[in-house]
Design a protein with these regions (language model features):
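Noncatalytic, solvent-exposed loop/strand surfaces
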Residues: 1-156
Length: 156
C-alpha cells in the first residue's frame, strides 16, 4: 500500500503475490523498499518473467521498469552516486546485482546464493565512496570497486 503520510489514506496498492507471482519466502513477503526521487524500488522476487526487481512511479504505482528473474531477499536496495553516475545495488536471494536505476539495465551480478536451508539474505548493500560490499548468509562477503560506467573491479 502507498499511504498519504498525514492522513493514512490509501493512494494506490499492489498485490505483489497476485501481480508478479511473488512467492511467500521463509518469513512471508517482507520487502524493504527504497524511495528515490519519484521512484520506488522493490526487491519483489516474482516468478513472472523479469520481475525480480521492480521500479514503480511512487505517485501512481505504475511500473517504470522491471529486471532480473531472481528471488527476493529481505535486504533494502541502495542507490549511490559514483563517478557522476547513479548506481542501484540490490542483494537478491541469489546474487549481488548492480543496475542503472533510471532504466533497469543490469551492469553486473555476483553469485551469492544461500547455501543453508531456512536462511535468507537480509543485509543491505554497504557503500563507501566508490566501494560496495555485499554480505550473504552462509556464502561470504564480496567487495568491489565501482569503475566509471558502472562496471566493477573485485577487491575481495
Amino acid at each position: 500500500h502507498c499511504l498519504q503520510i498525514t492522513t493514512g489514506q490509501v493512494l494506490w496498492e499492489k498485490d505483489l503475490k497476485a501481480q508478479f507471482d511473488a512467492p511467500l519466502r521463509l518469513y512471508g513477503i517482507g520487502h524493504s523498499p527504497l524511495i528515490w526521487g519519484d521512484r520506488l524500488y522493490v526487491n519483489v522476487g516474482g516468478n513472472a518473467e523479469q520481475t525480480g526487481i521492480v521500479c514503480f512511479d511512487k505517485h501512481s504505482g505504475n511500473i517504470e521498469w522491471s529486471a532480473t528473474d531472481d528471488a527476493a531477499s529481505y535486504a533494502t536496495p541502495r542507490i549511490a552516486r559514483i563517478h557522476d553516475q547513479d548506481c542501484l545495488f540490490v542483494l537478491t536471494h541469489q546474487h549481488a546485482v548492480a543496475l542503472n536505476p533510471h532504466d533497469g539495465i543490469e551492469w553486473w551480478r555476483i553469485p551469492l546464493s544461500i547455501r543453508i536451508v531456512d536462511a535468507e539474505n537480509a543485509v543491505s548493500p554497504l557503500v563507501y565512496q566508490d566501494i560496495v560490499a555485499f554480505a550473504s548468509y552462509g556464502n561470504g562477503t564480496v567487495c568491489s570497486r565501482i569503475l566509471p560506467g558502472g562496471m566493477k573491479e573485485e577487491l575481495w
